[in-house]
Amino acid sequence: MVLFGLLNLHLQYQKYGRQMILQERIEILNKLSAYMAGNEPEWAEAKERAARENPWFVPEFIEKAVNSITNSFLDPKLLTNWAAQYHVPDQQSQPKKVGLVMAGNIPLVGFHDFLSVFISGHIAVIKPSSKDEILIKHIVSELIKMDARVSSMVFFAPQLAGLDAYIATGSNNSSRYFDYYFGKFPNIIRRNRTSVAIIDGTETAAELDLLADDMQTYFGLGCRNVTQLFVPTNYDFIPLLTALKKYEYYLDFHKYKHNYDYHLALLIMGNKYYMNNDSLVFAENESPFSPVSQVHYQFYSAPEGLSHLTQNTDIQCIVGHGYIPFGTAQAPSLTDYADGTDTMAFLQTL
């Protein structure tokens, strides 16, 4: 059973004797992949409950997140190569307790952090987001059913203290809190980030269709969602707006429609120029961060003038020709680390 709190952490760790070796950890993750790809009644119920608890987690987004994890993260060959790249030992001689503060903007967004700690052989102490706790808790409970020793490697806690290291993901405001409490320990603290696309005007209809996915998957709430476009002067937006029409059904979701109506009204009352396709608004704005249902854009005259974007710490990834291919922003690999900070390398220093 999943433990809540840290009171029994040390005793629980000792209870099962021999640690899981690396190959056993990879094997159980392969079993987890099969479980997540299936439709066992308990798993189906957990996904349904997660969708009920958080209206932003519609079933199609939960399935997309699950498919991304099973296809890109849990393949045994990928895991073996990933661990070998960092010389992960079979067993940690002195496993460290690593606190994980997880975000909740999209389903299972904190899974990669959990996976990194688990495959490294350290002990994960997780504080899940209240917006996304059902899925991760169910996954861990299933792992424990597969092998009771997992219960000595993964814990849940309402508050994190007295640990060896911390990985915390949140907003710019919460990051100041994290800095204050976790700053004196080894840490990775992540702040607000978003993604942009550079359009050169030669994109095909198929590429624009894929860009629409990069923009609107998960309602645009992920840090890898494109929320700002850089387009050539005199760019014709009509083909892209047309490609985005496949997401008109988002207006059937009241939280999305509320955002759309509200932000459109602000632009109208402010007498601001905008474009829309009746479900998404384009507004010229220098900020890479845009609200749900709105995407910002800026014009450029020369591609060289955009070189600074690769150094912008607000930007998670750049989509476009010569950058991340269209349609792949929401399909990160094991080594696409959030904020560009190598989580596995960090864990190997503990």
Predicted regions and their residues:
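Glycine-rich nucleotide phosphate-binding loop and flanking beta-alpha elements
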Residues: 80, 106, 173-175, 237
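NAD(P)-dependent aldehyde/semialdehyde dehydrogenase
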Residues: 219-350
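Conserved NAD(P)+-binding/catalytic subdomain of aldehyde/semialdehyde dehydrogenases
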Residues: 6, 14, 146-235, 291, ...
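Donor nucleotide-activated moiety binding/catalytic core segment of transferases
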Residues: 85-105, 157-162, 172, 280-282, ...
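N-terminal Rossmann-like NAD(P)+-binding subdomain of aldehyde/semialdehyde dehydrogenases
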Residues: 2-99, 296-305, 314-325, 332-335
